[in-house]
Structures are given as C-alpha cells and as structure tokens.
C-alpha cells in the first residue's frame, strides 16, 4: 500500500509524469486535484498542460524551449565579435490546475492552452 508512504510525485518531465500516471492508475492510486497524491511535472508541453487543465497534474513548470534560440543568438554575437549581454534570462512559467491557488503560478485555462506557441 502507498498510504503513508508517499503523497507527492515529482517528475522531471511530462513523459515521466505520464508514466507515473499509468503506474498509479494500474495500482488504483488516485492523483491530481481530487486525488490522494499530488503530481508535479516539468516541461509544460501541450499534453502536459492539458492534463493540468483536466486536474490530473497539479502543477506543470515550464522548461522554455525558446531558450535555444536565445542561446544561439548570443553565440552568433560572440562569434561575430559583437557586444552581448553577459547575463541573459529566459522566462519560464509555472501552471497549476483549476482550483489550486498560487501566487507563484498561473491557473491553466482553455484560453492559455490555446494561445501557447508550443
């Protein structure tokens, strides 16, 4: 029995979260907003955010894929001998399922999901 053994699962990416969901489903363990286990993931892929909107993933933290473009731009400036910022920050976001209040994360909605570029 998992009871008393764990109540949070943290996954390093959305695919890992899907595997954890499959394993918990097979074991009859409830998770998400209405479950016994809080499920946290990192990636914020479209599917991961859909599961967040559905209340299966409590929180999904973005690993912004646009950071590669930003880094490539800095490298190009360096190679060209141009000035570049010594520190470049790429903004990430965190999203929570409806019904969860957080000052650090945005509540996932249909509108937010539809407006995502990735």
Predicted feature residues:
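Short beta-strand elements at the ligand-binding edges of bilobed clamshell
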Residues: 54-65
């Amino acid at each position: 029995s998992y009871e008393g053994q764990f109540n949070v699962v943290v996954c390093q990416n959305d695919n890992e979260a899907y595997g954890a969901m499959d394993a918990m489903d097979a074991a009859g363990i409830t998770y998400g907003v209405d479950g016994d286990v809080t499920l946290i993931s990192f990636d914020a892929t479209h599917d991961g955010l859909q599961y967040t909107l559905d209340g299966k993933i409590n929180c999904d933290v973005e690993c912004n894929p646009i950071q590669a473009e930003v880094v490539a731009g800095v490298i190009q400036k360096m190679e060209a001998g141009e000035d570049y910022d010594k520190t470049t920050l790429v903004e990430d976001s965190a999203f929570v399922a409806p019904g969860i209040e957080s000052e650090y994360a945005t509540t996932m909605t249909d509108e937010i999901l539809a407006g995502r570029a990735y």
